[in-house]
Design a protein with these regions (language model features):
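A contiguous pocket-lining binding segment that forms or flanks enzyme active sites
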Residues: 143-169
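Residues that act as N-cap/strand-start positions at coil-to-secondary-structure junctions
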Residues: 6-8, 18, 52, 73-75, ...
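Acidic, contiguous internal or C-terminal segments within carbohydrate-active enzymes
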Residues: 5, 95-147
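Conserved small/polar residues in nucleotide/adenosyl-binding loops
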Residues: 170-175
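Hydrophobic residues embedded in beta-strands of well-ordered beta-sheets
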Residues: 3, 21, 89, 120-122
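Extended, loop-rich substrate-binding clefts of extracytoplasmic carbohydrate-active enzymes
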Residues: 68-116
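Beta-strand-rich N-terminal accessory domains
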Residues: 1-60, 64-69
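Broad, structure-driven detector of short, well-ordered beta-strand segments within folded domains
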Residues: 10-14, 111-113, 155
Length: 175
């Protein structure tokens, strides 16, 4: 389900599916990628992995686990809407049978989107609800609309980067 908040400058909407932002509009202009054929997402939450382990398989506590998707399961999970204020939306994902089959940890992942003036703030809170140590990665993958008109846009990097394999960049040439 899609939820929206707005003020006099900014409006955002986010979905319970993946706790994913679907829109960021400033003065009525959309700044978030609107899910086209090139990429069918907007701004996924990456948890408990960024990219994935080799062959999507890893060991934890002496047992082998298989992560079903690249970047973990949060982006493909239904979050509960946990509340809103005039300026914020919050979503929560708790471990369940599907997550525990891929990731042997008890957790709560809360994602809160807040707006103030023309600023959007994203707050991610991961809570370990078990006694044992919990290992995870957390990231955001927002896609922004680039206003490319007449070829006046360039992409520059501070260092030369080389793609060694999907999801791996190195700043020095590969062997």
């Amino acid at each position: 389900m899609l939820y929206e908040i707005k003020n006099d400058k900014l409006s955002i909407s986010a979905d319970t599916f993946g706790a994913e932002l679907h829109s960021i509009k400033l003065d009525g202009k959309e700044y978030l990628w609107q899910c086209g054929d090139a990429w069918k997402r907007y701004a996924p939450i990456l948890f408990p992995f960024i990219c994935s382990p080799k062959d999507r398989t890893y060991k934890a506590g002496g047992q082998e686990y298989h992560m079903a998707a690249n970047h973990g399961f949060a982006r493909d999970s239904e979050f509960a809407f946990s509340g809103s204020t005039k300026n914020s939306l919050s979503f929560i994902l708790k471990d369940n049978d599907v997550t525990l089959a891929q990731y042997p940890y008890h957790f709560e992942l809360e994602v809160t989107y807040s707006i103030k003036g023309s600023k959007v703030t994203v707050t991610n809170t991961v809570k370990n609800t078990d006694e044992k140590a919990m290992y995870f990665y957390l990231g955001g993958h927002p896609a922004f609309i680039c206003d490319i008109q007449g070829g006046k846009c360039t992409v520059e990097y501070e260092k030369n980067e080389h793609i060694v394999q999907p999801c791996l960049l190195y700043t020095s040439p590969s062997p």
